[in-house]
Amino acid sequence: LKLTLAVVCVMFSTSLFAQKIGRISSQEVVVNMAEYKEAQTQLEALAKDLQAQMETIQVEMNTKIQEYQKGAETMTDAVRQLKEKELNDLNTRLQEFNQVAQQELQKKEQELMEPIIKKANEAITEVSKAGGYTVIFETGQMIYFDEAQVKDITPEVKAKLGAN
């Protein structure tokens, strides 16, 4: 009985050490995908468009500030209050536009990145299964690993996705 228990323990511990462990830099995979580069191009175009719209509002505001400053001394109180309200409203509009623009960019980024990340995760899973890996760790999350014992599958996943 003791011999059987010892043999079972040795076999169990051997099977634990036989696990195939890999690592991946998913960020490296994603940023090298053609889809990611296209998404970045779309995001940059959207950001440029939103920036141009914001600059238009800013120019309008600067013009009205200059007009206000030039005529402030000769304005009646009623006109001055009206102009100040107009400037405050324009400033509020600019701040609101900035906030909406940031939200729009974040939403678009999430919309574009979701299928890219899904595709990368599917490729990681396929390469992991094909390679017989039992565990894959994210490289950036590992504090220590023995490079001889943990294979980096990043190049294989990039090759599967056609990412340079």
Question: Model-predicted segments: where are they?
Answer:
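Sec/Tat signal peptide C-region and signal peptidase I cleavage site
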Residues: 12-18
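Amphipathic, charged alpha-helical segments and their helix-to-coil junctions
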Residues: 19-164
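Sec-dependent N-terminal signal peptides
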Residues: 3-12
